[in-house]
Amino acid sequence: MIKVGILGPVGSGKTSLIEFLAKEYSERGIKVGILTNDVVSAYDAMRIYHNLVERLRILPRENVLGLVTGGCPHTAIREDPSLNLRALETLEERANPDLVFIESGGDNVMSTFSSSLADFTIFVLDTSAGDKYPGKGGIGITESDLLVVNKIDLAPYVQADLNKMREDSLRVRRGKPSVFISLKTGEGTRELIRILDEELGLERVFGNKGQ
C-alpha cells in the first residue's frame, strides 16, 4: 500500500486534487483509498463520498474514511499521527487499497507529514494567493516530494507572474519536481500524472495498471 500525503493551505485545491487523482488511478484498475483530516467536521470526506461514491460511482463506500482531529491540523499528521495510523489500519482491513491519498487539514507552509504516515508528500499552493509564496519557502514548500501550484488559470486575474513562481520553485526546491496545473481547465494535469507515475514507481509496482 503506497501512502501519498497531500497538504497545503485552506482553499488551495487539495480535495479537488484528490478527486482528480482518485478518478485517474481508479480508471486504471488501481484500488484507491482516501483518508481525510478535518479539524471540526468531516466536510471533505462527505464531499468526496458524494462525488466519487454516490455520483460517479468510482469508489466503493468502504474506500473513503474521514477523521475529525480537532486542534492544530499538523499535530495529527506529524507530532502524533496515531489517530491516522489507526485509521489507515481500518482502511486497509476493510478495503485493502493499493494507493491511499491522505489529506491534511488546511495548514500553512510549515506543514509536513510524519514519515511513518506518508511515503510521498505533495504540497498544494493556490496561484491566487500570490506569486510570492514559492519564494517565501517553508518546509512544506521546500521539503515536499512534489510541489503542485494549482489554479494557474487565475494568474491573469490576480496579476501573478507564473514565470517568477516557476523560477522561485526551482530555486528553493533545489531540483525537486514542481508542476503548475489548473484542475478547472486540465492544463498541466498530464504532466502531473507523468511525474507521479515516475516518482511513485507505479509501473514497477502495479505492472500494466501503473501505465
Swiss-Prot record:
Protein keywords: Chaperone, Cytoplasm, GTP-binding, Nickel insertion, Nucleotide-binding
A Gene Ontology BP annotation from the UniProt entry: urea catabolic process
Annotated Pfam families: cobW (PF02492)
Localization in the cell: Cytoplasm
Molecular function as annotated in GO: GTP binding; GTPase activity; nickel cation binding
Protein residues bound to GTP: 8-15
InterPro entries to which the protein is assigned, alphabetical: CobW/HypB/UreG_nucleotide-bd, P-loop_NTPase, UreG
GO-annotated cellular components: cytoplasm
Subunit structure, interactors included: Homodimer. UreD, UreF and UreG form a complex that acts as a GTP-hydrolysis-dependent molecular chaperone, activating the urease apoprotein by helping to assemble the nickel containing metallocenter of UreC. The UreE protein probably delivers the nickel.
Family membership noted in the UniProt record: Belongs to the SIMIBI class G3E GTPase family. UreG subfamily.
Annotated function: Facilitates the functional incorporation of the urease nickel metallocenter. This process requires GTP hydrolysis, probably effectuated by UreG.
HAMAP family registered for this protein in UniProt: UreG (MF_01389)
Protein name from the UniProt record: Urease accessory protein UreG
Lineage: Archaea, Thermoproteota, Thermoprotei, Sulfolobales, Sulfolobaceae
